[in-house]
Amino acid sequence: MLDVKVLRQDLEEVKRRLAHRNEDISALDQFVEVDEKRREVIQEAEALKNKRNTVSEQVAVMKRNKENADHLIAEMKEVNERIKALDEELRQLDEQLEFILLSLPNLPHESTPIGTTEDDNVIAWTWGEPRAFDFEIKPHWELASQAGILDFETAAKVTGSRFVFYKGLGARLERALMNFMMDLHSNEHGYEEVIPPFIVNRTSMTGTGQLPKFEEDAFKIEGPDYFLIPTAEVPVTNMHRDEIMDGADLPRYYTAFSACFRSEAGSAGRDTRGLIRQHQFNKVELVKFVKPEESYDELDKLVKNAEKVLQLLGLPYRVLSMCTGDLGFTAAKKFDIEVWIPSGDTYREISSCSNFEDFQARRANIRFRRDTKSKPEFVHTLNGSGLAIGRTVAAILENYQEADGAIVIPEVLRPYMGGVDKIAPK
């Protein structure tokens, strides 16, 4: 949520920065209209309440003097009815104002490249060289089928499209990656390990920015107002909702394993095969709560933490600085990490690392005090994938494939695989 004071005091600057997102910003004009009406209602209500107080004193004096005050009492009855109506109008205007504020995206940071589509994203750097194969490259779903480690057909029968059964060494590889990532982030990068609920309430989804704008993308549970989480960012960030944190405890780092659930609305016909775009997938998430002046240094560290996973796995990747038109609703600055997928001769996203500044903190009311005498301030929140496990499996299968269809297990994972160094086709 944007700072209301900034909207009121520097609206043109807000319009300028939001215009770079290539989105409809007419809600800003609605904000001005509703905010002005709200101020008028407050002024009228306060004037009437002051009048009521004054007249009440007059009525008391007249009654003590045994004078007739019926005309003033009748007038005050009308005033009270008007105040009641104004209070209800103010409540409705506050609801409208909150809805408008919740619908406005974050302001892009000045260092975010200006652009309209993914074609305007800037390659910041690359790591590793894509392997030169001397045989025909197979996509990961073919390799997995030959090895009997992924079963999309049975998952389609049991549930539907965009689901998968991991079997045998495939299930072990998924679990090995989860343990490897969690160990790396908790033991070497200083994150506290968390396994959160996979179901959250509406307030939590609103706090991190998924609602109200993207409700159609979420899996809603019938009955109670619950949602399956699209990412562990939602429950982990909301751990500190409505809290005032101790500044001495910042920064706070959390790493969380969870299943993630995405409806993939608008993705019909895209990535219909394999692990790249699933309705359910596992992910290790990185979440930070930091002081405002430290958040961009912390973003750099966050990206490096996610990169380290790919470096240890020996998977080539590149890092993109996302442009204003491809930034996402909540981020002020975002880097995407894309891993090399040989069968597509392309890089595919495997992590997004974002600085939300105080955007989520305002929505979720997450604050901190620098010391006991200081006023509470909003924290800055950050999050990134560390990594999406299914896409990491796909990248390993394709980058480590051999001519006979076998898949070599990256050396760093072998202790987590019980010493298994290769998955052979059946």
UniProtKB/Swiss-Prot annotation:
InterPro entries: aa-tRNA-synt_IIb, aa-tRNA-synth_II, aa-tRNA-synth_II/BPL/LPL, Ser-tRNA-ligase_type_1, Ser-tRNA-synth_1_N, SerRS_1_N_sf, SerRS_core, tRNA-bd_arm. It is found in: Cytoplasm. Transmembrane segments: none annotated. Keywords: Aminoacyl-tRNA synthetase, ATP-binding, Cytoplasm, Ligase, Nucleotide-binding, Protein biosynthesis. ATP binds at residues 262-264, 349-352. L-serine binds at residues 231-233, 285, 385. GO terms for biological process: selenocysteine biosynthetic process; seryl-tRNA aminoacylation. It catalyses: tRNA(Ser) + L-serine + ATP = L-seryl-tRNA(Ser) + AMP + diphosphate + H(+); tRNA(Sec) + L-serine + ATP = L-seryl-tRNA(Sec) + AMP + diphosphate + H(+). GO terms for cellular component: cytoplasm. Pfam families: Seryl_tRNA_N, tRNA-synt_2b. Its EC number is 6.1.1.11. One of its GO terms (molecular function) is ATP binding. Pathway: Aminoacyl-tRNA biosynthesis; selenocysteinyl-tRNA(Sec) biosynthesis; L-seryl-tRNA(Sec) from L-serine and tRNA(Sec): step 1/1. Disulfide bonds: none annotated. Belongs to the class-II aminoacyl-tRNA synthetase family. Type-1 seryl-tRNA synthetase subfamily. Catalyzes the attachment of serine to tRNA(Ser). Is also able to aminoacylate tRNA(Sec) with serine, to form the misacylated tRNA L-seryl-tRNA(Sec), which will be further converted into selenocysteinyl-tRNA(Sec). Homodimer. The tRNA molecule binds across the dimer. PANTHER family: SERINE--TRNA LIGASE, SERYL-TRNA SYNTHETASE. Consists of two distinct domains, a catalytic core and a N-terminal extension that is involved in tRNA binding. This is Serine--tRNA ligase. The gene is serS.
